[in-house]
């Protein structure tokens, strides 16, 4: 596939998605980020149908003019990330935007998105999934839509509930190979695994909060048996790209695309260490998905 054409098409979808107001689980930003990564596995595999699906899905949503602007705001004279954290806890979008406007004068917008990712993980906001997609897509588009991306993240963080943070929460070492698969938690675990292994500026704090959050999941699997296919071990992540290419278009849906990309990312960071475990989880998911 033409790499530049793909980038242009997905970049346009990404920009449009920043002005879509929908539920987190079906938001097009999830699909755009996933399609970008699946196609990136091997550009020699023709995914024109997947691109068309992504474009049509994005265009199926209504757009709002804006969630807010960072121009002409009343920026406080002294501001810190602590100020932004307080305004986010209070669900005060206007004050959060004021704080961001001030922070942008002294801080890189990329750092602000990382902070928003850290915040959403620390306070267990369901928006962390979208913020993570925003982080990855901004790398893809060379941070061309930073302001819109920040506003988008703040909007979704302030409109969703968060959980109180406590240092007293039990911390559990994130032992991915011991995770007991659960329909309710596997998506969060796979996202955490990817974030855990990403080279982030705020890595130490983010890692600490992930360790706290995974304490709520079951990591007691002795993992005596794995179920893999020979072609999965042979082709690695490329198997996922080929699988979705050969899938009948009628069976494509946002959740399947999103989940396949979560497993792709896990395989990337596993680098052979946990591959059989990841393939077993994926095969279990596909078994119940297509039953």
Residue ranges of predicted features:
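Mature, well-folded catalytic/scaffold domains that follow N-terminal targeting or propeptide regions
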Residues: 1-291
């Amino acid at each position: 596939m033409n790499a530049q054409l793909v980038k242009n098409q997905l970049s346009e979808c990404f920009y449009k998605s920043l002005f879509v107001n929908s539920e987190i689980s079906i938001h097009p930003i999830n699909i755009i980020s996933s399609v970008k990564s699946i196609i990136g596995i091997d550009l020699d595999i023709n995914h024109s149908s997947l691109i068309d699906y992504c474009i049509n899905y994005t265009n199926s949503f209504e757009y709002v003019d804006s969630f807010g602007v960072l121009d002409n705001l009343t920026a406080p004279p002294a501001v810190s990330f602590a100020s932004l954290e307080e305004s986010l806890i209070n669900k005060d979008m206007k004050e959060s935007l004021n704080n961001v406007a001030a922070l942008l004068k002294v801080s890189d917008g990329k750092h602000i998105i990382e902070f928003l990712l850290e915040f959403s993980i620390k306070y267990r906001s369901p928006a962390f999934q979208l913020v993570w997609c925003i982080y990855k897509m901004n790398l893809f588009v060379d941070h061309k839509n930073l302001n819109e991306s920040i506003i988008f993240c703040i909007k979704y963080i302030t409109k969703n509930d968060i959980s109180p943070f406590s240092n007293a929460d039990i911390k559990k070492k994130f032992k991915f190979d011991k995770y007991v698969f659960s329909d309710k938690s596997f998506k969060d675990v796979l996202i955490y695994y990817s974030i855990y292994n990403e080279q982030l500026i705020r890595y130490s704090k983010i890692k600490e909060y992930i360790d706290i959050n995974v304490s709520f999941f079951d990591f007691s699997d002795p993992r005596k048996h794995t179920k893999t296919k020979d072609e999965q071990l042979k082709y690695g992540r490329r198997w996922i790209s080929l699988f979705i290419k050969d899938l009948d278009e009628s069976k494509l849906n946002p959740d399947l695309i999103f989940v396949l990309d979560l497993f792709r990312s896990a395989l990337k960071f596993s680098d052979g260490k946990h591959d059989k475990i990841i393939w077993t989880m994926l095969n279990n998911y596909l078994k119940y998905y297509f039953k």
